Amino acid sequence: MESAAGILEQFHIDVKTGKQLASELRKRLAGGEYRDIPYGDWLAKKVTADLRDIVHDDHLQLRFNYWLSTTESAAKQSEEEARQAVAAHCFFDKVEHLPPNIGYLKFNVFADRDACAKAAGEAMDALADSDALIIDLRDNRGGRGGMGELLASYLFAGRTHLADSFRRADNVTTESWTTPDVPGRKFLGKPVYVLISRNTFSAGEGFSFVLQAQKRATLVGETTVGGSGTIEFKPIDAHFTLVVPTGRVTSPANRKDFVGTGVVPDVKVPAAEALDVALRLAAQSRHGNRSGAGAKP
C-alpha cells in the first residue's frame, strides 16, 4: 500500500488531492485497517472504496489479478478485449432511423479504435443521409478516447483541434485532433444532438464536452458526474494495479474542463425524457433546414 500512496502523490493530476489520498491511505495502513484482509480481491475492493469515499471519483481503483501480470499477459488481455468488442459489433447497440428521418446512434462503451474503425464507419455511413443525428450516451460509462476522436471526425469537414490533455507528472500537454479522412461518409452541415445523464462518465463526458465546446452539438439531458480526465494503469506488483487520474482534459475553444462540475447540458430535462425532447428539437431543425437554416460544423 505504500507503493500505491507513492503513485498517488507522484502521478495524480491534482497535487493537493494526490497528497490527501496518500496521507489517508498511509494513516489507514498504519492503523491496521488492511492487515487482516485475507484475499487480494477483498483488499482491492476495500482500498477502492476508501479512495472513492475520500474524493468521490469513480476512476480511482485498485485492481487485483489472480494471475501474474506481465507485459505479455497484458498484451493478450488487450487482444482479447478487442476481439470481444468486434464480436459485440463494437458496442454500437442501436443504429436506427427514427421518424422523420432522424439518425439515432446509441452505444454504452467507446471501443478500441483500431479494432472498431470499420464498425464505426459503417454506423456513421448508415446514418449519413439523415436530416439530423442523435447520439445517445445516457448509459455510456467511457472506454477508449481514440474512438471518441474517430467519431468526432465524422462531424467536422476539416482537421479540427478537439482537446488538450495535460499530464502533471511530466508537465506534458497532448493535443487531440480529428482525422480528415475516415471510412464512410461524414455527417456535415446538419444538427447533432447528444443525450447525456448522471450515468454518463469518463470518455462519454469528454466526447460530449468537446462537441459542445466546439458548438457542433446540442446536449440534452442531465448534468454528468464530472469524472476526472485521462487515466493510467500503474502496476504496484505482479498482482495489483492502481488506476489513477493523471491528466486533465480542456477544450481549446474555451480552456475549460468538466472535472468536479460535470458536463452541463444545453437543454436540461430528466434523462428519461431526453430522447423525446431531442426528437422534437431535431424535427424543428429539420423544418428550419428546409427553410435555409441549419447548424454548420
Residue spans for each PLM region:
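Terminal peptide-recognition signature
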Residues: A4, L51, L105, I135, ...
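A short, well-ordered alpha-helical element
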Residues: R113-D131
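STAS-typified acidic loop motif
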Residues: A85, H89-A117, A253-N254
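Gly/Ser/Thr-rich loop/hinge elements
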Residues: G142-P191, G229-P235, T246-T250
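Low-complexity, Gly/Ser/Thr/Pro-rich intrinsically disordered linker/tail segments
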Residues: V259-P297
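Short acidic catalytic loops
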Residues: L105-V109, D129-G142, L195
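Solvent-exposed loop/turn segments at secondary-structure junctions
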Residues: Y66-T70, V109-R113, D139-G145, H161, ...
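Extended, small/polar residue-biased N-terminal targeting/export presequences
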Residues: V15-P100, R286-P297
